[in-house]
């Protein structure tokens, strides 16, 4: 789930009856301290000159995850948040480096990123974390499904697919309400269901 505020990786072996598991995502939680957490905040932070390296996967010039969320509260002009929401904002060029939104134009050491690239960087962090934990089963070789809001129009969906492709993933999209329905079915033990249509 490439969420607006958090991303999560849930996975299951392809065998019948296999239980889904949440993948613990390594990330910086403070400058210089890495932890595995079930959620990766969908935040990017551009470290100030002289701050330690950005994250366990060398996402320079951006720090991604919990440290980005925390530092973003302290230095708000250097953080990108809610990048996924920008994918459906038709009034801006979603492929242009417009984020962090509202940051001072004259800040020469502040990198800029497009909404598509910001989403791709979050997905890339997830891919590299998975690949490091599962070197014999890289994520690019797995069947990847990304959930998207039902409100995403065709352009936002295509941009999500582009972000995944830019992160080295081939992904199928699934609307979030449909994903929730499938999850509820699995928890109820319903392997098969029939639809009743009524007027």
Residue ranges and their predicted role:
Residues 1-18, 189-199:
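Gly/Thr-rich phosphate-binding beta-strand-loop-beta motif of the actin/hexokinase/Hsp70
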Residues 10-12, 156-160, 183-187:
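Short acidic, glycine/serine/threonine-rich loops at helix termini
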Residues 16, 153, 180:
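Flexible, glycine-rich phosphate/dinucleotide-binding loops
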Residues 173-199:
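Conserved phosphate-binding catalytic cores of ATP/NTP-utilizing and phosphoryl-transfer enzymes
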């Amino acid at each position: 789930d490439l969420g607006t505020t958090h991303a999560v990786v849930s996975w299951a072996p392809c065998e019948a009856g296999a239980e889904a598991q949440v993948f613990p995502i390594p990330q910086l939680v403070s400058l210089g301290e890495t932890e595995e957490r079930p959620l990766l905040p969908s935040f990017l932070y551009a470290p100030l000159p002289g701050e330690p390296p950005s994250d366990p996967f060398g996402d320079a010039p951006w720090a991604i995850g919990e440290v980005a969320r925390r530092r973003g509260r302290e230095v708000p002009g250097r953080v990108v948040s809610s990048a996924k929401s920008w994918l459906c904002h038709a009034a801006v060029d979603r492929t242009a480096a417009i984020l962090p939104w509202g940051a001072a134009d004259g800040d020469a050491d502040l990198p800029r990123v497009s909404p598509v690239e910001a989403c791709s960087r979050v997905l890339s962090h997830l891919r590299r974390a998975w690949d490091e934990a599962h070197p014999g089963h890289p994520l690019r070789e797995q069947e990847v499904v990304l959930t998207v809001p039902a409100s995403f129009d065709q352009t936002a969906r295509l941009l999500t697919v582009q972000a995944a492709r830019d992160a080295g993933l081939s992904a199928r999209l699934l609307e979030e309400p449909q994903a929730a329905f499938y999850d509820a079915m699995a928890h109820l033990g319903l392997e098969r269901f029939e639809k009743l249509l009524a007027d």
